[in-house]
Amino acid sequence: MSHSSGTDMALNFSTASLHAWNGVSLLLIIFVTWIISGMSQAKSKIERLLICWWALTGLIHVFQEGYYVFTPDLFNDNSPNFMAEIWKEYSKGDSRYATRHTSVLGIESVASIVLGPLSLLAAYAVAKQKSYRYIFQFAISIAQLYGTIQYFLTAFLEGDNFASSRYYYYSYYVGQSSIWVIVPMLIATRYWIKIHAICKRLQDKKVTKVG
């Protein structure tokens, strides 16, 4: 597989420092959310982990992806702006971000404006054990899966040639984006099984009453 030269922009921060600060920020969000989830109505560790996932993904959608959507000139920003630097670094794996390709701009717009707030609401729903939490998490996970598949598919249809090297292709484009395939798929499967079980119990109860 050949790859285009991509977008190798001069960065104010080293790649290692960007990954370190980004990683620390994400871990801090997870840690704080985990502590808070312990004071919630969540009934199991899995539900507490789900609260962490929805809080983390919601904040990423709203702030990180929202920054990309609503800052059209971020790639011209030469100041040591951490958020802009993150996107400049990621564009090494997908140069469509640097050119603000309509496909990624559309996907990121939906993610930041719609899926971000809904993900945060999902975290609240699990924490408060709301009756709609199963169907809500299932629906948002399907939407995330759809967006990620669309992201991969649009690149494939245009030649899948947007990374500056194989390293960035597999570590950034494939590796990071695959998280939004694997986790939503696991959550969607979990709640499909739970919703199906509830529907079956209701159906069996109805049949018993009729009989």
UniProtKB/Swiss-Prot annotation:
Residues 46-188 form the EXPERA domain. It comes from Citrus sinensis. Its main location: membrane. One of its GO terms (cellular component) is membrane. One of its GO terms (molecular function) is steroid Delta-isomerase activity. It catalyses: 7,8-epoxymelianol = protoglabretal. This is Protoglabretal synthase MOI1. The gene is MOI1. PROSITE patterns: EXPERA (PS51751).
